Amino acid sequence: MDKKQFIKICRKLYDRKYVVGSGGNVSVKEGDKIYLTPTGSILGFLKEDDIAEMDLDGNVIKGKPTSEKNLHLMIYRKRNDINAIIHTHSLISTFLSTINKEIELLTPEGKIFLKKIGYVDYYEAGSLKLAEETAKRDEDVIILKNHGVVCLGKDLIDAYIKVEVLEEQAKLTLLNLLVKK
């Protein structure tokens, strides 16, 4: 696993305010191993040695994985095509979920990269129920009501691009709402 790229993506998420404080988490699956951000970590200050490791059976190999580890684990078990997961608290995407407004795919990039957005009702962060309901979704981009977003990818860059494009579509959706009033 490319730990330098993992750290670089985590810093981008933090620097671009897709996550704040100790919010959000990232994972990469390689073979039967999952590399995850540790619980309570601040993604903008993560170091290579901080990265936690688990196997696909849920056994911790190194560190203390994110409290959302079950969400990552259940998605990887269900989706063989997914090798990276990014969970953020992107501001506009999350805000729209609080007012029950679905994000519209308004540009070619939105339609190409996101295709379709899934939605999950509110469940407590880190709960087994949240993990189960999220893993039931077939989309690569999932909005967690009043919580954040989960973007899945064939690799870390693919998942990251979906985070960026989703937030752009959310901003456009919000602007559309404001103009229509």
Swiss-Prot record:
Binds 1 zinc ion per subunit. Zn(2+) binds at E68, H87, H89, H147. InterPro entries: Aldolase_class_II_sugar_metab (IPR050197), Aldolase_II/adducin_N (IPR001303), Aldolase_II/adducin_N_sf (IPR036409), Fuculose-P_aldolase (IPR053406). One of its GO terms (molecular function) is zinc ion binding. The active site is at E68 (proton donor/acceptor). Its EC number is 4.1.2.17. Trimethyl phosphonoacetate and DL-threose are competitive inhibitors with respect to dihydroxyacetone phosphate, and uncompetitive inhibitors with respect to DL-glyceraldehyde. Involved in the biosynthesis of the coenzyme F420 which requires phospholactate produced via the aldol cleavage of L-fuculose 1-phosphate and the NAD(+)-dependent oxidation of (S)-lactaldehyde. Catalyzes the reversible cleavage of L-fuculose 1-phosphate (Fuc1P) to yield dihydroxyacetone phosphate (DHAP) and S-lactaldehyde. FucA possesses a high specificity for the dihydroxyacetone phosphate (DHAP), but accepts a great variety of different aldehydes such as DL-glyceraldehyde and glycolaldehyde. This is L-fuculose phosphate aldolase.
